[in-house]
Amino acid sequence: GAGAGIPSHTHLNKLDEDKLLGLGDQKFSLVYYLSVGDQSCSEPGVLKFYEPDEELLPEEGMVVIFPAGRKHSAVYGGEKKRVIVGINFYAL
């Protein structure tokens, strides 16, 4: 809803970080944007990636797949509802 946001984070857990198993390199995150909400506001829900820094302004119907270990964040300050589907998966 309005004012929603997620501070910078990754989607790796302790098991993913076990170097012996090596699962972290095979884990990915997917975001599917069903509704991007109000992008005319000051915080339009930009998906920010870190190291290297990149910004992506989502569009309805867009699918973004990235390594689960990549630090990212998103802040949305619009009044309209924003609807996304987020999934983490392993490519084994």
Protein language model annotation of sequence segments:
Residues G1-Y76, K81-I84, N88-L92:
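Catalytic core of non-heme Fe(II) oxygenases with the double-stranded beta-helix
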